[in-house]
Curated annotation (Swiss-Prot):
It comes from Mus musculus (Mouse). Glutathione binds at residues 10-11, 49-53, 62-63, 75-76. It is an enzyme of class 2 (transferase). Homodimer. Interacts with PFKM isoform 2 and isoform 3 (via N-terminal testis-specific region). It is found in: Cytoplasm. It catalyses: RX + glutathione = an S-substituted glutathione + a halide anion + H(+). Its main location: cytoplasm. One of its GO terms (biological process) is nitrobenzene metabolic process. Keywords: Cytoplasm, Phosphoprotein, Transferase. This is Glutathione S-transferase Mu 5. Conjugation of reduced glutathione to a wide number of exogenous and endogenous hydrophobic electrophiles. The lineage of its organism: Eukaryota, Metazoa, Chordata, Craniata, Vertebrata. Belongs to the GST superfamily. Mu family. The keyword Signal does not apply. Residues 93-211 form the GST C-terminal domain.
Length: 224
């Protein structure tokens, strides 16, 4: 393992790490991954992670984690901000920083709605309710983006990586969900066209699925 490489630890799924992976790729950061594998049903053995969870000198042991020399960070958005600060991707003006802060929190609230649905044993019965309210939520993001190029304004920031990932997961869940929102679709295309992102999406380091872990009711399988 290179002493100069960051180490990203997470389950072998997209989950909360996908936006981090994309930001690492976009910023040309040298990194390696430590992927932990969850066991199969019915036990879903998590011992690969639990056996080392309290041995890594993490203040709040959890996944994902990022290790960068003496800096050891948990909480996915704290990791994103840590990387983004190194590359001036947290917004420049006060307006940009406010928009970044709003989006960081709003998109995570939105993410967790889909996460809770996907891991709920009553998933199939709850899915119609989620889909019914989805357009209203997407409309809010569409209005917030407006005619801006990126969600903070005209400057690419880490929340664009976060937002792309969450919108993409919803697009996989309901393929037509963005059709009513041309500016969101254009945002997705712009993001995918970024040179480093386009290269990552075509690389063997990228995987579309699984989004969730094996105990989830949706998004828990690889695409063959």
């Amino acid at each position: 393992m290179s002493s100069k490489s960051m180490v990203l630890g997470y389950w072998d799924i997209r989950g909360l790490a996908h936006a981090i992976r994309m930001l690492l790729e976009f910023t040309d950061t040298s990194y390696e991954e430590k992927r932990y594998i969850c066991g199969e049903a019915p036990d879903y053995d998590r011992s690969q992670w639990l056996d080392v969870k309290f041995k890594l000198d993490l203040d709040f042991p959890n996944l994902p984690y990022l290790m960068d020399g003496k800096n050891k960070i948990t909480q996915s958005n704290a990791i994103l901000r840590y990387i983004a600060r190194k590359h001036n991707m947290c917004g420049d003006t006060e307006e940009e920083k406010i928009r970044v802060d709003i989006m960081e929190n709003q998109i995570m609230d939105f993410r967790m709605q889909l996460v809770r649905l996907c891991y709920n044993s009553n998933h199939e019965n709850l899915k119609p309710q989620y889909l019914e309210q989805l357009p209203a939520q997407l409309k809010q993001f569409s209005l917030f983006l407006g005619k801006f190029t990126w969600f903070a304004g005209e400057k690419l920031t880490f929340v664009d990586f976060l937002t792309y990932d969450v919108l993409d997961q919803n697009r996989i869940f309901e393929p037509k969900c963005l059709d009513e929102f041309p500016n969101l679709k254009a945002f997705m295309c712009r993001f995918e066209a970024l040179e480093k992102i386009a290269a990552f999406l075509q690389s063997d380091r990228f995987f579309k699925m699984p989004i969730n872990n094996k105990m989830a009711k949706w998004g828990n399988k690889c695409l063959c």
